[in-house]
Amino acid sequence: MDRLHTSSADWPDHLATQVVRVRGGVLQAAGQSDHVAEETPVALEFNGISHATMLVTPTHLDDFALGFALTEGIVGGMADVRGVELETRCDGIVVQVEIATSCEVRLKERRRAMAGRTGCGLCGVETLPEVVRDVAPAADSDALPVHNVLRAMQSLRSRQTLHDATGATHAAGWADASGEVVLAREDVGRHNALDKLIGALARQGIAPLPGMAVVSSRASFEMVQKTASAGIPILAAVSAPTALAIRLARQTNVTLLGFVRNTDATIYSHPQRIAA
């Protein structure tokens, strides 16, 4: 990637606001403050073409744009990305991504007009084939001890600084084979957090094997689709998966775990990757 101009530090990820609290059914005195997460309209443009508008926590927007481009199949890898630039406007932020001209056919195929709901990855998709698109199966990988998966989820919790401040964000983390989370991203939208993580992995040249993705949310169909698109073999979620997510995980050779909490977990697909 030749060019990367970002200044996400210009946009706060949370702010303080005046509140009136109720405690034990009793109104408390006015004048107290609370920290709340920011969400900002972020428009993604590829080669000058407006593609999608999302509500996003305004941090790591370069990673978000890269991860979105990768998991949506707009680009095949970082070699297809020429540069990323961020522009602040009065009504939000525009992320301009320059991609190889050879990717423009895929861009037109995946073009969607998305707006409105936080982390709504499927808003604006017009046909079912656009939703259930072909994704290459994840590569086979060695089994990881279940203890390392549990450790990874516990490690992710310690990386959720924005959630600690606001209680409003999801996190997605990348853990190595030992279960240590080496990279994490947060966002008000769970899909956005995962896109940020995948973009960061690609930008930093971190291979998806061996290791796992851990998320502080449920595992929806699109979370599995993004995981498989990135070649990540294991997805561990703190909450439940959906039936469609399980079917896709089985189809794409992704090991899907849900209810990963403390010393417990449920494995829904490809349990051969999890060892005692």
From Swiss-Prot:
One of its GO terms (biological process) is Mo-molybdopterin cofactor biosynthetic process. It comes from the Bacteria. Pfam families: FdhD-NarQ. One of its GO terms (cellular component) is cytoplasm. One of its GO terms (molecular function) is sulfurtransferase activity. The keyword Coiled coil does not apply. Gene3D superfamilies: 3.10.20.10, Cytidine Deaminase, domain 2. SUPFAM superfamilies: Cytidine deaminase-like. Keywords: Cytoplasm, Molybdenum cofactor biosynthesis. It is found in: Cytoplasm. InterPro entries: Cytidine_deaminase-like (IPR016193), FdhD (IPR003786). The active site is at C120. The keyword Thylakoid does not apply. NCBIfam families: fdhD_narQ. Belongs to the FdhD family. HAMAP family: FdhD (MF_00187). Required for formate dehydrogenase (FDH) activity. Acts as a sulfur carrier protein that transfers sulfur from IscS to the molybdenum cofactor prior to its insertion into FDH. This is Sulfur carrier protein FdhD. It comes from Bordetella parapertussis (strain 12822 / ATCC BAA-587 / NCTC 13253).
